Amino acid sequence: MKVGIVGAGMVGSCAAFAMVMRGVASEIVLIDRNEKLAVAQAHDILHGTPFAAPTRIWAGTYADLADAEVVILSAGVGQEPGEDRMHLLERNAKVFGAIIPSVLAHAPDTILLVTSNPVDVMTDIARRISGLPSDRVIGSGTLLDTARFRSLLGEHVGVSPKSVHAYVLGEHGDSEVLWWSGANVGNVGVQAMAAQLSRPIDAAARARIDEAVRRAAYRIIDGKGATWFGIGSGLARIVQAIATDEKALLSISARTDVCEGIPEVTLSVPRIVGAAGAGAPLVPNLDDDEKKALQRSAEILKEAADGVHI
C-alpha cells in the first residue's frame, strides 16, 4: 500500500515511523510546506528500516500522491497549552481549504484520514471540501482516547489493556463520553471483573480514570507542547485495518446518524474499518446518562460544524 502524509511534523512523522515499524505500507511519501523538514524526517525514518519492515519512504510533492490509497492529513496549526480543541477550528479550516484540492488532483480515489484538531469538525470540513463519500473521509476521532481508557482500566484491574474492550464515544475533546456500561474485560463486565480480582472500581476510582482520560492531552501538552507518539501509533493502526481489509472495530470519527434527534453529525462511535474505509457503525447500547452525554456531545459538534461556511 502507498500512503501519503501531508504535514511532516511530529504527528505525521510519528505516524510514518509507526507504519514502518508495523510494516503496513510499502511506500510512504511525506509532504510539507517546509521541504527541508520533510526531507529530514524521511531520511531519519528511512535509516530505521533495516531494523523493521522494508519500506520506501521519501519527501515529495502532491504529484507524488498518485495511486496513494490513504492520505493522512496532519497539517495545521498546533494546539496551544490550555487551548480548547474547538478554538483551533477557524485556523485549521483555512489550511484544509488549500490542501485538499491539491491532494485530490493527484489521488482522486484515496481515503482521507484526518488527524488535525479539532478532528471531528475537521473531518466534516474535509468531507465537505472534498465531496467524497463519508466512508472515505474518516478522522482519528476517539481512537487515542479509547486507548487511554483501556490502558487505565487494565492498569487498575491488573490485566493487559489488549484484553480490555472499552470505547470512548462522541467528540475527541471535552464532551467525550466514556462508555462505562459497555466496558468489558474479556467477556465479563469491567465492574464484575474488577470485583472478582479484588480491585473494585468504586466512585473515586471511576472519577480518577474518567478525569485522567479527559485531561491526558492537556497534561502532555503542558509538559512537552503536543502529543505525537500515541496518535501516531493510532493512525498506523487505522491504516493497517484499511491495508489488510481487516474489518476491525475501531472508534473513529465519521458522518453518522446514530444520535437520536440529530440527522447527521461527524463524531466517534465504533465502526468496522476495512479497505473501503469507514464501514457500518456499532450503535452503542448506552445507559440514560451516557445517552444524554452523547447527545450533548453531538449537539456541540453539530453546532461547530454548521458554523463553518465552506
Which residues are covered by each model-predicted region?
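Aromatic pocket-lining residues of Rossmann-like dinucleotide-binding sites
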Residues: M19
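C-terminal substrate-binding/catalytic lobe of Rossmann-fold NAD(P)-dependent dehydrogenases
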Residues: S130-R136, T146-I310
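Conserved N-terminal Rossmann-fold NAD(P) cofactor-binding segment
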Residues: E27, I31-E69, E83, K302-I310
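Glycine-rich Rossmann-fold phosphate-binding loop(s) that bind the pyrophosphate
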Residues: A8-G9
